[in-house]
Amino acid sequence: MRGAVLTLAFANFAAAPVAGAPCEVFEHKYFAGESVAIERNQSLPRLGRLNDRISSVKVASQCLMVAFADEEYRGITTTFGPGEYATLPDGWDDQISSLHCNCR
């Protein structure tokens, strides 16, 4: 029982958002795994190790995150409004290759 409690506490810690990051992407569903914090109005033309491996997203209020299926802002796109997306919509799990975090 003690091991289960410690595991749950660690899982909650890993899912905590990075302070001040208006957009954040995560390798696994439910905000788990490796994450990358994206600053206000920052664009990432390539995602490195997270290319085609993003499965959840957080977007701060007054921000939008535009995701692209291909590197260099190419291919089909989708836009995530403010909120927490523990799972991504159909067709976008493990499909994001570049993105913009646009904030007012």
For every predicted segment, state its role:
Residues 2-7, 11-104:
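Compact beta-sheet-dominated domain cores in extracellular/mature segments
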